[in-house]
Regions:
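Ligand-binding loop in jelly-roll beta-barrel domains
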Residues: 93-94, 107-136
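A short beta-loop-beta micro-motif enriched in histidine and acidic residues
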Residues: 52, 64-77
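Histidine-centered metal-chelating micro-motifs
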Residues: 66-68, 86, 101-103, 107-116
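Short acidic-glycine-tyrosine-enriched beta hairpin
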Residues: 61, 90-109
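Sec/Tat-exported extracytoplasmic proteins
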Residues: 58, 63-65, 81-84, 89, ...
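Glycine- and acidic-residue-biased ligand/ion/polar-headgroup-sensing regions
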Residues: 73-92, 99-101
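A short, N-terminal "cap"/entry segment at the start of jelly-roll beta-barrel domains
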Residues: 2-55, 96, 103-104, 122, ...
Length: 142
């Protein structure tokens, strides 16, 4: 039993070392502005009589960057490409999403925090919105 526990500890240590070695190299230029680039917007075929649209945005927050409180009237699935995203939706605990991690946001959740967790490096993520055709992707919250 002790040998099995020891092998597990060694395997975990080796995996951690490999994962650290495979991290992306830090960026040499620092982007201090928030950038949003539409990657895709495609109307989907009607399903059960509902017309939907999927839109993919690439969002970049510069070091210390963030957005103001807002909500999305549609489902959002996101994936962090680089850096660490700090997020807090009303009624939920604050969360950190690192490069390679994904997140889900229910429609109309109020985003109290959407920010770069770093003061040195930008964070970049893809946000996949699935909405009604006429729905705006984001609405400011006073």
């Amino acid at each position: 039993m002790m040998a099995q526990v020891r092998r597990t500890e060694i395997a975990a240590a080796l995996l951690g070392t490999v994962m650290m070695a495979c991290r992306p190299a830090p960026r040499t230029s620092i982007d201090t502005e928030t950038q949003v680039r539409k990657v895709l917007s495609q109307t989907l075929p009607a399903m059960d009589g509902r017309g939907l649209r999927v839109t993919v945005l690439e969002v970049t927050y510069g070091p210390g960057g963030s957005s103001r409180p807002h909500r999305h009237p549609c489902v959002v699935v996101g994936s962090v490409i680089a850096g660490t995203l700090r997020s807090r939706v009303q009624g939920e605990p604050e969360a950190l999403y690192r490069a390679g991690e994904s997140f889900y946001e229910a429609p109309n959740g109020v985003h109290l925090v959407s920010a770069n967790a770093s003061d040195r490096d930008p964070v970049r993520f893809l946000a996949y919105f699935t909405c009604d055709h006429d729905a705006p992707l984001s609405e400011a919250v006073p």
